[in-house]
From Swiss-Prot:
Protein name in UniProt: Putative fungistatic metabolite
Keyword Repeat in record: yes
A Gene Ontology biological process term: defense response to fungus
UniProt keyword annotations, A-Z: Antimicrobial, Fungicide, Repeat
Stated role: Inhibits the growth of the fungus P.tritici-repentis.
SMART domains: WSC
UniProt KW Repeat keyword: yes
Domain WSC: residue ranges: 16-110, 127-222
A Pfam family per the record: WSC
Amino acid sequence: MQSVLVLAAIVPAALAQTYYGCYTEIPTRALTGAVPLIDYEAMTLADCEAHCTGFDLWGLEYGGECYCGNSLAQGSFPAFSTDCTMPCPGDATLTSVCGGPNRLSLYGTSETAPESLPYPHDPPVTTTQYEGCYTEVTEGARALAGASGFSLTDMTVGGCGGYCRDSGFTWFGLEYSAECYCGSELSVNSTLAAEEDCAMPCSGAAGEVCGGSNRLSVYQWV
């Protein structure tokens, strides 16, 4: 079942279409329905909306790129809201957001968010298993060296787990209340710590634990 992250990014001024949130980009593009509009000097939300007239979806990336399509390509899925923080350069107030590095601020014509199809795991994974509180690696690669995410407002155990699973990883860990790290395995340099070292509440769920200072609440998809 697809994990839905609580998205709390800045929502731009009202437009004719619906804002769905921040989504991941893929190497072959999440939206491939038209020639992209590129303008790193003066891009606005309205410019991208107009460029994508006739399409069901449109997204802005890197502060100046606009992509259109009728569906999301496999591998694109909801990301953390704070991954989309690059301002639109054509907005003099710099309050509207035009995605981020490999992240799309996604809009569309439907009130319902588009279906996303993350890459499948082989064998499939269905549940998470808590592995314990582990130390972060302070020199070299992190304890979990795959994808990562950060959110001061909406980090949860389920959100991190879904993000890492959909990114293709089976291990995930939460640190400092707001950090999420993914990996295919846990570094041998990370060791089991005292459980009380992981006591920081998650930024998006005060009743959940998201690691501690240089400590990871570590889980595995099984």
